[in-house]
Amino acid sequence: MNTRIERDTLGEMHVPQDKLWGAQTQRSYENFHIGTEKMPMEIIYAFALLKKAAANVNKKLGQLSAEKADAITWAANEVLAGKHDDHFPLFVWQTGSGTQSNMNMNEVLARRGNQLLQEKGLDVTIHPNDDVNRSQSSNDTFPTAMHIAAYNKLDDHLLPTLQMFKQTLHQKAKQFDDVIKLGRTHLQDATPLTLGQEISGWARMLEKTEQMIRESMIYLQELAIGGTAVGTGVNAHPKFGEMVAADIANETGKPFKSAANKFHALTSHDELVHTHGALKALAADLFKIANDIRWLASGPRGGLGELIIPANEPGSSIMPGKVNPTQSEALTMITSQVIGNDATIAFAASQGNFELNVFKPVIIYNFLQSTTLLTDGLRTFHDKCLIGLEANETIIKKHLNESLMLVTALNPHIGYENAAKIAKKAHAEGLTLKEAAMQSGLLTEEEFEKMVDPAKMVHPQG
């Protein structure tokens, strides 16, 4: 492999000739070659956006020449366009402040910026620290990138997918609004409801969690940039943080703003804990929905069999004709991972010793993983299961007609104890409720049929 010599404050490093990074990135790559988890590209792009804004503001403040600022901007735009993805090789498992990833971006933008300047015949040299990182520290840039990446991932990907999923649930609720089925509580038969009513409950769950996510995202709008090393803003213009946040807001069209207290912004990540808590709530809801569908589709002959799910693939390598609830299984595994990620994020966020939290990479890695998994899981479940979900009305009607819990409709007419006697007699002697009621001498056939009407039970009139 052809290499070139790059230098930092610790000495010389051999760097691959065709790579844009420098000595500090190379050191990190060699010192922290751990696992397979690379720094998420969402963070890389957030960094590029931040460095572009910082260069623009430094130019406005007279801290950076127009030639250097423009070259950094050009290079950052190339990164944002995905042209240099393979020049960001670092792993999540590095310094807890994310310094190596900050320097990775600084070095790539400096070298690429210098190449662009040379192409224009300009005798100007960009330095990764003095120019690209001017007025900044890893301690305020990395948390800024964390918030940008998290907010964008939620706003651009998860929330639109969640809205699509929710809309289809509403459509299914309307489609099955007239299908009266047996209700179940405690895994036991209960009074009836419509399948549409049951699904409407699922839709409302997602409406609430969507609202929780949106409300929590307000805190992610606050950016740490301008705090520099410990929150005081040393080596930065007093207006730098505010101006950079405004530039990022203008560039993205999203309501980013400068954090009111930079000391908090560097040492605490309670905003991400709070927002991920909403993601955990979404995960809990999705587990329940996927699990209900899985159980209601169980069978086809030995289970509940009230729902029919699409047959997407053979279900067994040994049992022919088997169709498994694979989309439910995938989604429930995803939600389990998200709930586990929440524990990691909460613990990591507690490690804000003095002026700086030093678990930043693992916090944002898990946050972005949760968001990606939920987005992909929602879309796949929607496309491969939810849209094609059908009601097995024959089985639904059979279960409803055999239910002893229809006896609940008799409570207002003959009292709880008499109704219970009818249910027990029917169960013990294998009778229908009507037969048990008539044999008990409590009701005539006409009275029973007037009082026990599932359609009236799902839409009571008082």
From Swiss-Prot:
Q: Which pathway, metabolic or otherwise, does it act in?
A: Carbohydrate metabolism; tricarboxylic acid cycle; (S)-malate from fumarate: step 1/1
User: What catalytic reaction does the record list?
Assistant: (S)-malate = fumarate + H2O
The keyword Cytoplasm is assigned to this record = yes
* GO cellular component annotations of the record: cytoplasm
Q: Which UniProt keywords apply?
A: Cytoplasm, Lyase, Tricarboxylic acid cycle
Principal cellular location given in the protein's record: cytoplasm
**Broad class of enzyme this protein falls into:** lyase
Marked site: Important for catalytic activity: 329
Active site at 186 (proton donor/acceptor), 316
Q: Which residues bind substrate?
A: 97-99, 127-130, 137-139, 185, 317, 322-324
Which PROSITE patterns does the record associate with it? FUMARATE_LYASES
Q: Does the keyword Cytoplasm apply?
A: yes
Q: Which GO terms describe its biological process?
A: fumarate metabolic process; malate metabolic process; tricarboxylic acid cycle
Q: One GO MF term, please? A: fumarate hydratase activity
Q: What is its EC number?
A: 4.2.1.2
Record InterPro entries:
Fum_hydII, Fumarase/histidase_N, Fumarase_C_C, Fumarate_lyase_CS, Fumarate_lyase_fam, Fumarate_lyase_N, L-Aspartase-like
Q: State its location(s).
A: Cytoplasm
Free-text function comment from the UniProt entry: Involved in the TCA cycle. Catalyzes the stereospecific interconversion of fumarate to L-malate.
What is noted besides the main data? There are 2 substrate-binding sites: the catalytic A site, and the non-catalytic B site that may play a role in the transfer of substrate or product between the active site and the solvent. Alternatively, the B site may bind allosteric effectors.
Q: What quaternary structure, including any partners, is listed in this protein's UniProt entry? A: Homotetramer.
Recorded hits in NCBIfam families, A to Z, give: fumC_II, PRK12273.1
Protein family per UniProt: Belongs to the class-II fumarase/aspartase family. Fumarase subfamily.
Q: What is this protein called?
A: Fumarate hydratase class II
UniProt lineage: Bacteria, Bacillati, Bacillota, Bacilli, Bacillales
> What gene is it encoded by?
fumC
